[in-house]
């Protein structure tokens, strides 16, 4: 499975909706799909499944606002 699909699969699992796959520009926090607890779960899943460590202190909500932005941020960390 391609990197992009892996990230979207993780997001779909955490948010419990396929809306993140259908609309990769959806504002995850504004729409209530991610909160602080879900963000921690997301970072743990990313580390476990993609072997990419994202320190919580480096997580900027504005830069991780949409699935598309998350994919871009993670590609930079690969």
UniProtKB/Swiss-Prot annotation:
From the Swiss-Prot or TrEMBL record, what is one GO molecular function term? D-alanyl carrier activity
List, for all copies, the residue spans of the domain called Carrier: 1-78
Cite the entry's keywords alphabetically.
Answer: Cell wall biogenesis/degradation, Cytoplasm, Phosphopantetheine, Phosphoprotein, Virulence
**Which PROSITE patterns would you find in this protein's record?**
CARRIER
Respond yes or no to whether keyword Endoplasmic reticulum is given for this record.
no
Q: Which domain of life is it from?
A: Bacteria
Q: Which InterPro entries match?
A: ACP-like_sf, DltC, PP-bd_ACP
Post-translational modification, as annotated: 4'-phosphopantetheine is transferred from CoA to a specific serine of apo-DCP.
State which pathway it belongs to: Cell wall biogenesis; lipoteichoic acid biosynthesis
The record's Gene Ontology cellular component field reads: cytoplasm
GO biological process: what's one of them? cell wall organization
User: In this entry, which stretches build a coiled coil?
Assistant: none
Read off the Gene3D superfamilies from this record.
ACP-like
Residues where O-(pantetheine 4'-phosphoryl)serine occurs? Answer: 36
Any idea what job this protein has? Carrier protein involved in the D-alanylation of lipoteichoic acid (LTA). The loading of thioester-linked D-alanine onto DltC is catalyzed by D-alanine--D-alanyl carrier protein ligase DltA. The DltC-carried D-alanyl group is further transferred to cell membrane phosphatidylglycerol (PG) by forming an ester bond, probably catalyzed by DltD. D-alanylation of LTA plays an important role in modulating the properties of the cell wall in Gram-positive bacteria, influencing the net charge of the cell wall.
Q: Which family does it belong to?
A: Belongs to the DltC family.
Q: What is this protein called?
A: D-alanyl carrier protein
């Amino acid at each position: 499975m391609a990197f992009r699909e892996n990230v979207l699969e993780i997001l779909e699992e955490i948010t419990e909706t396929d809306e993140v796959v259908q609309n990769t520009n959806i504002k995850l926090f504004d729409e209530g799909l991610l909160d602080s607890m879900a963000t921690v779960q997301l970072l743990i899943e990313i580390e476990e499944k993609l072997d990419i460590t994202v320190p919580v202190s480096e997580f900027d909500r504005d830069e991780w606002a949409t699935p598309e932005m998350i994919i871009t941020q993670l590609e930079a960390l690969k």
